[in-house]
Amino acid sequence: MKLLTLTKLVLSMTFLLIISINAENTIYAKFETPQVTITGNADDPAIWVNEMESNLSIVFGTDKYNGIYSYNLKGEVIGFASAGRINNLDIRTLNDTNYFFGTNTGSNTIDLWIYKNSVLTDAAKAKKFALSDNARYSKKTNFLAYGICAGITAKNEIIAFVTEAKGPRIQLWKFDNDNLKLMSTFNNDNASESEGCVFDDENMTLFVSEENARGIIRSYKLTNEFELKDMFKIDDRQRNIVGDPEGLALYKTSKNDGYLVASSQGNNTFNIYQRNYPYDFISSFVVGDSNLIDGVSDTDGIEIKNNYFNEDFPNGIIVVQDGKNTGNVIKSKENFKYISLDQLQHILDL
């Protein structure tokens, strides 16, 4: 009887803690996209920021068995690329040129699309844009390609990291002279599988999520010689991660400061860490149900931009994949949710 009472007490305290976190750190979606066409397929968002006409920015979302959707800032579809099994997508902009990197799990390739700002702006004005069905560049990874994150080095080099499904490897690619070149291959420690990653351009730091057997977020420093060094274990299941750590995103408050945000998939929360070493855990938040839009659960990909977009997103935007779109009849079909960044700023007391 005493053991049973103690167990009930512990469970009750845990429940109250969860309720407390949810009550204080709950944010809500402002818009959502339509569901993807096939069950269980939405995965990773990416955002092209229109620096000249911010309201004409474009959100992209992968439908990982079909291709890539394009959305406006209200979550409305403005195009679809039948690009195949694009699992993850990331974007970097240098001068007036935009580089869209994707991983194709059907062909096990790193794919690259390139567009000028003017092309994207004109298309956004016309409310019609899709990436081409065929990437401009495509190279075999020679392993099961899974996640991807792009970057720009201090020397203005366009790079991308590809993570391996069912293995520890990470490839570093560089785009130069109209060519995708494999620069090096590393191991994410002894990981069994990695997907989510994000590269901090200004701090030359790679963050990677390990899934499956263990749930670990690690950081690595990238040298000018394209070597990953100084591995650091930021968090794991013995601390603040439940289930798999999935999508990773940076919320930059200045050139070198800000926060790392990670999807803790097992308890439908998002963890917040300091952007810089030792990457201290700060807090967690959830995306809850509102009167119009359901909450978010089982999230894979996440993206954050702190630009002014419009009156709906005056301080920035968070876009997350919703793995259980419970507000619709077909609950197993997924979509993407848009959240105003000012809600996260309130949690962080910024």
PLM region descriptions:
Residues I19-A23:
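Sec/Tat signal peptide C-region and signal peptidase I cleavage site
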Residues E24-L350:
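Sequence/structural signature of beta-propeller domains
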